[in-house]
Amino acid sequence: MKRGKTAVIVGAQWGDEGKGKIVDVLSHNFSIVARYAGGHNAGHTVIIKGKKFVLQLVPCGVLRKGCRSVIGNGVVLDPLAFLKEVKMLRDAGVQVDGNLFVSNRAHVILPYHRMIEMGAENAPGRVKIGTTSRGIGPAYEDKMGRRGLRVADLLDSKLLKSTIENACREKNMIAHALFNSEPLDADSMYAEYAEAAKQIAPFVADTAVLLNQALAEGGSVMFEGAQATMLDIDHGTYPFVTSSSCTAGGAATGTGVPPNAIQNVIGITKAYCTRVGGGPFPSEVEGAVADQLRARGNEYGAVTGRPRRCGWIDLPLLRYAQMINGVNWWVVTKLDVLDVLDEVPVCVGYKIKGKKYDSVPALATGFEQVEPVYEKMPGWKKSTEGVASFDDLPKKAQEYLRFIERESGAKIGMVSTGPDRDQTMLLPEFEAEIIHPVEKHPLEKAAPKGAKAK
């Protein structure tokens, strides 16, 4: 039987490219949106008719009627953050019950993960990565060290209690010795998370079964990435990266669908570039130009509120992202931010000690030595905000986009010209290939047989 259509949404830069908006725009064409990596360190912002939603764990598809949402096994779940987000959605009138499923194999973030991360980030002499201090990294460390607690384990009260008691003994000792941290109380932690487990239980399912059965029945799935290519644990600017596989390859391992089920990879890039926290950023600019980009683009973290570092679009980086992810379509966001510029520099290559490179260095130290090579393109000095057709864009804006397309290895399928859901243009070829009516919703009534956690 032919599987339903699939697409992965992946960030091509250092995150904050606008993935949440794009998932929201496209989600009405898919039966399911599945999140496959990261935790509540990723803030995806969606604006619908002026109303702002910031989703950190729940996939953005939850905001579309008829679209089901899945939190996959590759995600690390903070139960309290999840329940807070569910409450926010319910209060806003969003239907989550029966529409939202959490993998029973997803790992759980507990207070000692936050304690360890905060201590490590603030320890003297340690390289500051710029984490959100929400316990993401330590939770993944426990997962890889086979010490983690999964959502299925969270629902087993005896296992939950013994895991918390054993972990608190170990983590308290480590945190006190290394960071002089105050100890955490295992009994109060167990009481709080045992109660949270009761509230989470109705959402828990074997989501790998759920997703594969939906695809087999002709349902369509969009895989929602978190963070971005250059923050990927393997392919990013290590060690200034996140702790999960946030490239397109993570969609299969992070949800339990087979790799050959992935049909399209849609890479999201801003019309310029930003980064939060430490780490190399070859095309970064400072001063008045950075302030202008930051102000026009509202470049502040959706989760932390931290100001983002700003710079010009980096084509070697985009080519790298295209190669690693197999991107076959680009979505360019925040084009309107550049409307006021007389000229728009584009990083077309790198120099290291006078030698030209057009690829991305493996070492962060190599990245820090990079001197960007720029080609300056003329600005268009006209508003693109809300423009709905490519042909209606200013000529110079069209040329800018075609240059990016020509030099980056994939076609542009969508352009975002404002923050609202409706301020988005779809190019005809992309629309013909990706946009399609959803004829059936395999999850309309309940999780399929065999999906519900025991």
Task: Label each residue range with its predicted role.
Residues M1-K454:
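Non-transmembrane, aqueous-exposed alpha-helical and coiled segments at domain scale
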